[in-house]
Amino acid sequence: GGTSLVESMHCNARVIGFDIDPIATFITRFELSASQFENHYPEIDQVCEEVARQIMPLHRTKVDGDEYDVLHHFWVQVKKCDYCHSEVELHPHFQLAYSKEKKLQWVFCKYCHAVHELPINRKILECSCGKRTTIQAGTYNNGIMTCPNCKRTQKIAADNLDSAETPIWKLFAQEYLVGVGRNCTRHFKRTEQDDLERYLYAKRKLECLNEVNLVPNRLIPREGRSDGRPMIHGIRRYSDFFNDRQKLHLNLLGLAIQKVENNEARRCLELAFSEHLTANCMYTAYAFGYRRTSPLFSIHSYRHITRPVELN
């Protein structure tokens, strides 16, 4: 934002700007004054270290007795079939990621969620649990759910804003890191009981912070909208965009930023805090071929994600 103001200032003009959007105003004001800031503020490192000490243990996983950092947590929306009442995981396919360069893909069993590395042209997964999974035959496509039990189809969006059910999410897989620096490698695994317990621990810690909740719980405005998203998918409040571990992270980070006395350092942190919300919510997707997150508003709309990824 503020391109005309910033470029005019580069030409030594005295600039004055107005905007009705407080976020745009904050960003542009920061851009205009950034040249006067220092290159480094120790307060920023202190905030990162303080929050990391509290949140990083909740982003660890155990593999063969050893602990590793989790890079991405994979979630999937679960919806009940209107006809047979079975619970259906809304997977667009059963592929977590792929690499054209390595000619590999990482897929998971739709029954037990075990993750396998296969050649990229493989169409069927023969899992060690004894079940077969057709990799591209997902249960969700273009807003329509197909029940694997009764084969009936239904829309996942509600017909009106008031009848939409709040999404139910299930943690089913993780991408974790082995090694450090140039020797660091990325691996996939299904979630185990220890991973679920870490999430529940985060939920309990969040409950202890209820009196200082910084995540906005106000209703998303309905007036003046061109479509019903995200309310037709059960997202009615801004807090509904985040799971409990993300809310804990946001609260701890927000509280730490509030304590920073240096105004310039705090402004830098506030801007980074605002920007990182789009990649730390349950509307964050995963770019399968690039193995990285695709933030909220990457296509300039409330695109509903049935298989979001939670970033460390």
Residue positions per predicted region:
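Nucleic-acid modification enzymes, centered on SAM-dependent nucleic-acid methyltransferases
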Residues: 9-312
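Long, structured ligand/cofactor-binding scaffold of large enzymes
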Residues: 1
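Conserved SAM-dependent methyltransferase scaffold
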Residues: 4-5
